[in-house]
């Protein structure tokens, strides 16, 4: 039987926060979950002590449904196995696993077999069907999305096509959703909830660099481009970013343009790096990868994550009056 996202995850608002690497730390994920939606930690390449530290903060910050996102194609099967093992061993069952891109079936089976909810983001019909067959909540990404693109279809077209094939699956629309009106369009196309990424880049709890946040708020969809230039650390995947001097001239030398700190360790940032500028990044921020979707035109300024959740609460399926009250109560506590 078809369930809304709220029913599938045991949350009050049918909304997922994207587990954006570098940007979505424990503070953002917990704030979203405490507001009644489902927050998500950007696990990205974290493993070992660094991942354990982030998981401890995540679990300490909320006892509600909250996720950890990993990227199979970036880390490879062995590292992904280590990451999944840590989450299963070190967190309670309300922590769900989110995967960006369709992994091997064995990975899905391991997660669901452990009694954890699985969320898989896809960009093609084939992967959407595979994810649903594995019992996953299926995040349907359109090319309107910021960040790395998993397919070539527009959001609502892909949602509608998958809904026709998967009448009982829980489908979550992603890409270009910056307003309740846009969320309503996605629901009308057949979605059971929505995922927001760019909208949470500018959340007060986000770890995005202030320059990045300001640039998103000052932009509209014409300021974004789909490119493949930010390929160091994640090659072979097109991505939507804010246009920069680097996207306009990709023949510049691959020299270091900044530094950043991840879980206490300092790293240099080369030009064309896939890494986003965070609050710990210094250097030529304006040349770095600032992932941004077509929703930016509806985003006007930094605000608490709870305010973002509250804005969408009344329009999303499965939320209802109870969900709205919960969001307002949570906001009052922040």
What do the PLM-derived regions correspond to, one by one?
Residues 121, 175-176:
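Conserved acidic functional residues
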Residues 1-170:
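Active-site entrance/lid segments in N-terminal catalytic domains of soluble metabolic enzymes
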Residues 145-149, 153-172, 178-334:
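Conserved active-site-proximal phosphate/metal-binding subdomains
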């Amino acid at each position: 039987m078809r369930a809304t996202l709220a029913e599938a995850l045991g949350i009050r608002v049918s909304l997922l926060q994207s587990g954006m690497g570098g940007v979505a730390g424990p503070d953002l994920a917990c704030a979203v979950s405490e507001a009644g939606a489902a927050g998500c930690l950007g696990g990205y390449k974290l493993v070992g002590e660094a991942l354990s530290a982030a998981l401890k903060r995540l679990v300490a910050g909320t006892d509600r449904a909250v996720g950890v996102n990993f990227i199979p194609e970036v880390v490879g099967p062995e590292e992904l196995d280590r990451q999944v093992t840590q989450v299963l061993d070190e967190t309670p069952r309300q922590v769900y696993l989110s995967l960006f891109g369709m992994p091997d079936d064995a990975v899905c089976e391991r997660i669901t077999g452990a009694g954890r909810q699985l969320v898989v983001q896809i960009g093609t019909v084939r992967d959407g069907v595979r994810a649903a067959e594995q019992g996953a909540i299926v995040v349907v990404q359109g090319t309107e999305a910021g960040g790395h693109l998993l397919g070539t279809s527009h959001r609502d077209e892909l949602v509608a096509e998958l809904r026709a094939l998967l009448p009982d699956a829980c489908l979550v629309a992603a890409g270009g959703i910056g307003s309740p009106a846009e969320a309503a369009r996605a629901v009308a196309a057949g979605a059971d909830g929505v995922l927001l990424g760019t909208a949470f880049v500018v959340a007060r709890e986000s770890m995005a660099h202030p320059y990045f946040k300001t640039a998103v708020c000052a932009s509209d969809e014409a300021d974004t481009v789909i490119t493949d230039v930010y390929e160091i650390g994640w090659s072979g995947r097109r991505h939507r970013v804010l246009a920069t001097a680097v996207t306009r001239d990709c023949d510049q030398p691959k020299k270091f343009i900044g530094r950043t700190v991840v879980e206490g360790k300092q790293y240099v940032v080369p030009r064309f790096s896939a890494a986003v500028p965070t609050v710990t990044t210094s250097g030529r921020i304006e040349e770095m990868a600032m992932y941004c979707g077509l929703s930016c035109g509806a985003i006007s300024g930094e605000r608490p994550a709870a305010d973002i959740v509250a804005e969408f609460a009344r329009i999303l399926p499965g939320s209802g009056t109870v969900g709205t009250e919960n969001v307002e109560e949570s906001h009052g506590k922040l």
